[in-house]
Amino acid sequence: MTKEWECRREQIIELSKINGMTIRELQARMSKMYKFDASIRSYKRVLARWGIRVHRQRFVSPRTEEAAARTASGDVSKALDELVTQLFHARQSDKDSLAQIEANFGLKLSKRALHYRRKRLALKRPPPDSHDSPNNSIPLMANSCLLSADNSSSSTTSNPNVAPPISTLPDPVATISSSSSSHLDMGAIHPPHHSSLPPHMGVDPSTMADAHNAHSSLTPPQSGYSSMPSLPYLQQPFQIPSQRFSRQQQSHPFPAAQHAVNGQPQALYPFIYQSRNVPMGSTMFASSNQSAAHPDGNNALPMDNTHANISYMQSSQSMPVNSYSYDRYTPNQPSYLESKPGNHQPSYTSEQPMYSTASVPQQISNGPTAVNGLPMNSYTPHSNHLHSPSPNSNSGPTDSLSAPNSTSSPSMAHANGASFASQYPSLNKSIFPASYSSSAEDGQNMQAPAHAYMQSSIYGVNQEQKSEYPSNLSMQSSMSIKDPSQLQRIHLYPQHSQYDPNGMTMRDHYSERIEPEAKPSDETLTVRSSRDLSVHNVGTLPVLSAAAATQAAMPHTMGPSAHDSASAPSPHMQSQQALPYQYYNPLPAMADPAQNVPQQLPPPIHSHLSDDQHIQYSYPNTFVNRFPQNIHHPSANLLDASAALNPVQNPLLMPQQNHEHSPLVRSDAALHDHGPLLPVYPDVDSRFV
């Protein structure tokens, strides 16, 4: 007996030097690695005789090995961490990983210990998603390539006692051939940085399958086990493509070559910039072509016919047809089959557009030939990025300029519907909500004016329609431009031009219109003075008398006595008049028709109201007046109901700047005396803290 112990002495001493080693673990290791079996009691006895102190067990628990692994430090723990990491990146199942660890270290870990260790190493896998189930084969395919023959055979032969577990990985070749038969694009598999992939991963799946048939490069090693990928793998761990968003294809960064012909990016943007139904060949950038050709925007000359099909030929050559089209088709749309990833022959030739009549922008219309009058509501949501040539304009873009009086009166089309609704009139009603269907007849071809960038959906009204902005809010009926001199006055870039009286800048297209300020005219001053007088006799309301404002000055009122019958004042008006004048904000009244405020842009909200209601809006009543940010809100006096809310919910009370302006709440002196004795919560009204 003692002889045996003496043989094993230096092995035991070596193991016992490892930092967190406990007696039970020592016993387990010796029996695994050297097939040396002895009871724990005998270990204690012998170690005591040799004068070797080994840690007592730190955790009295059924999972001692787990505890040991947790506390193991030094060489064991480093090696263990490395192995766990490798197993993780090779996507081994838990069962296999545990078997590997047991084989290499003699540590019989529990699953829980393994997970704990992974957590410590910050190895996290995104939680399995129900959506991703079809993709689960992909990383496995990549892995079986990683576990190449030389790695695994070397690591298997290096320690003969190891019995590596039988792998759960499927046969890589089956996976590959099945994926290539389904036209699975490798673009979806490999991560954006190709550097981290083994050299044969970048190849097309079909060639991979062929290569395998020629000489089996991908088969797992002859021993039948797939074991760990060796260490170089740890330096640059495998990048699995993010599975979480597998539904939406990955957007590849633009290749530089595709960047421009005529300044027009050929690659399609990912989903956000893409309107829903534009087929794959079409590019969304109708305007940039023209602005590159004529940067100053003044000489809009027709281009020669060679450019007519340019967006076609490029998009069919520069983008591989079998790559995914990024816009989302659903299978019930007729255009679906044509751009399906597997379809290698494009269904159209390069000189014939994909859809016959109206679907795709071929060339830019130079100069708007006509704009059909559309009522605002059907126009606003999507004015058009696209423009589709009329059926007869295949000969060349010059038709539209040379024959401005031609019979077709094209109308604006919305970006969503145009391409495909005009082609399939029967679907027009069903797929798009009513407000989006084109207001012209279905067969009519759609055409947009030249500076199509002004009509993207965020800029509400495009330049030229904003120029005619009649007070009844519908567009002028089909203004058409006959002489080229008029063309030069429509500027490509927004700036002050004769067309917009206010000289609006870009931001005004999508923010609310700001009324031009006007110096208060005589009428409004009369109103103010009469209001001052009316403080004494509380009941009366100041109204514009017929003398103060004649019929000509007040085009909106129905007659001098209109205020009593037609426009009954709101209940708030009473209390508003009763207060002394200092509580009103001296805002200028609404712009007066009598002055030279340009007529084209009437204030859209107030245009139907009579003048004394304008007064009511421009002088909000006292309650609202405490909250200065609301004074401009046209319905300010309707918001009084919110005073009943508790102040934290109350949008009017919240911001703290209010109280500096409002004498009703606190005098300024009171504010500055105390200083911030109480903590200041920005989102809570300070009176209630």
UniProtKB/Swiss-Prot annotation:
Location within or outside the cell: Cytoplasm
Top-level taxon of origin: Eukaryota
Biological-process GO terms, alphabetical: silent mating-type cassette heterochromatin formation
Keywords assigned: Cytoplasm
UniProt keyword annotation of Cytoplasm present: yes
Principal subcellular localization: cytoplasm
InterPro entries: Clr5_dom
Compositionally biased spans, kind Low complexity: 133-158, 381-411, 560-572
Protein name: Uncharacterized protein C29B12.08
